[in-house]
Structures are given as structure tokens and as C-alpha cells.
């Protein structure tokens, strides 16, 4: 089994690269999906979030947009949330990996904060997806409906491409066409398959 961390700034194209790798046979596990799972109603994570952030509970459930807004500009609150969620996400990722029976599996863990959390060191290969800031802002305003100011604030809140690249084994630039990106992903996939084959 080969453990691959996939990261990149918001709007860089992580999800697109993950989908391309999945289409080629990778087992893709998304940290955001696991984060939603570990604070789903009835989980210990949900109870901890409700206790720490009672102001984001609506009708007994966590209002995820309100939670995101609550922690975005408050570093202390964000650290508290990460202390609840990140250990549970790591635990669930471990369970997913343990359940895989194929020794030649390429497991890609997609995590926007892989570098910021120090988790990159736990992966045999780290892939960083980059794109020019103007490209990312365009994607965020068009596809996600953010204002330019919101997009810039989200980008500024994350590690820089240079910080991510310092932890990377592979840097995929995603400023061109889908065809160009697909060709780059194909080369990376071929390399990953060679690594897992031994």
C-alpha cells in the first residue's frame, strides 16, 4: 500500500486531481468528508463541538456554515475545533486504510491543511496542486459564489504555495487546460504505480 497526501490551496484544483486519480484506480479519502462524518449527529465529535460551540447549534444539530464562520477569524476557536476534529479524522483514516486488503493500493488522502497541521510527514508521497492566485480567485468567485474579498481572505488564511511545495514530493501546476492537467496526472499516476509495485 502506498499512502499519498494530496493538498493545495483553496481553488487550486485538489478535487479535480483527486477525481482523476480515482478514475485511474486510486482509493481516494477526503479529509473534509471524514470531518463531516466525525461530527455527524450522535457522534462523540458532535457532542464535543456542541459543548465547546453552543452558539452554532440549531435545533440540536451543528450548523456547519455557522461553525465555519465562527472559527474563521478566531484562531483560538479554530485550534479548539481542530483539537476535536483532527484526531478523529486521523483515527477514521487509519480505519479506512486497515480495511483495505489490496497490498498494491494507492491511497490518496485529500486534505486542504495537510501542511498546516504537520500531517504531511506521515505520507510516503505528498502531491501539492498549485495555481496562480488570479486563477484561484476566478474559480472561487465563479464556481463557489464568493466575492473577490472572500476569496482573497480564504487564500490568505492558508499556507502559501511555497510553504506547501517545501513539503512536496510532486508539485502539479493547474493553470492550463483540463487536458494539460490530465496529462500531468497520468505521469504522476504512472510513477505512483511504479512505487507501489516495488
Region locations from a protein language model:
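Small-molecule kinase domains that catalyze NTP-dependent phosphoryl transfer to phosphate-bearing small molecules
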Residues: 92-94, 121-122, 142, 146-193, ...
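Short, acidic/turn-prone active-site loops that include or flank metal/cofactor-
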Residues: 33-36, 57, 132-134, 153-156, ...
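An amphipathic alpha-helix signature
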Residues: 24, 46-50, 133-141, 148, ...
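Glycine-rich phosphate-binding loop of ATP-dependent small-molecule kinases
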Residues: 1-62, 190-198
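Short, well-ordered beta-strand core segments
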Residues: 28, 124-128, 171-172
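ATP-dependent small-molecule kinase phosphotransfer cores
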Residues: 33-106
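Residue-level signal for inorganic ion chemistry
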Residues: 13, 32, 81, 108, ...
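ATP-dependent NMP and nucleoside kinases share a basic, alpha-helical "lid"
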Residues: 93-102, 106-142
Amino acid at each position: 500500500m502506498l499512502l499519498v497526501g494530496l493538498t493545495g490551496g483553496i481553488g487550486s484544483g485538489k478535487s479535480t486531481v483527486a477525481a482523476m486519480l480515482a478514475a485511474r484506480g486510486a482509493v481516494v479519502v477526503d479529509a473534509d468528508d471524514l470531518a463531516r462524518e466525525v461530527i455527524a449527529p450522535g457522534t462523540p465529535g458532535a457532542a464535543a463541538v456542541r459543548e465547546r460551540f453552543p452558539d452554532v447549534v440549531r435545533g440540536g444539530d451543528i450548523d456547519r456554515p455557522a461553525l465555519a464562520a465562527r472559527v474563521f477569524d478566531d484562531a483560538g476557536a479554530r485550534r479548539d475545533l481542530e483539537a476535536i476534529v483532527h484526531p478523529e479524522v486521523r483515527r477514521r483514516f487509519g480505519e479506512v486504510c486497515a480495511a483495505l486488503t489490496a497490498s498494491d493500493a494507492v491511497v490518496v488522502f485529500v486534505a486542504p491543511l495537510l501542511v498546516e497541521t504537520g500531517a504531511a510527514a506521515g505520507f510516503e508521497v505528498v502531491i501539492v496542486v498549485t495555481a496562480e492566485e488570479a486563477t484561484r480567485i476566478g474559480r472561487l468567485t465563479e464556481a463557489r459564489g464568493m466575492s473577490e474579498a472572500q476569496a482573497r481572505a480564504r487564500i490568505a488564511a492558508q499556507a502559501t504555495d511555497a510553504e506547501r511545495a517545501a513539503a512536496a514530493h510532486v508539485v502539479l501546476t493547474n493553470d492550463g487546460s483540463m487536458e494539460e492537467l490530465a496529462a500531468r496526472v497520468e505521469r504522476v499516476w504512472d510513477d505512483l504505480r511504479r512505487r507501489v509495485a516495488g
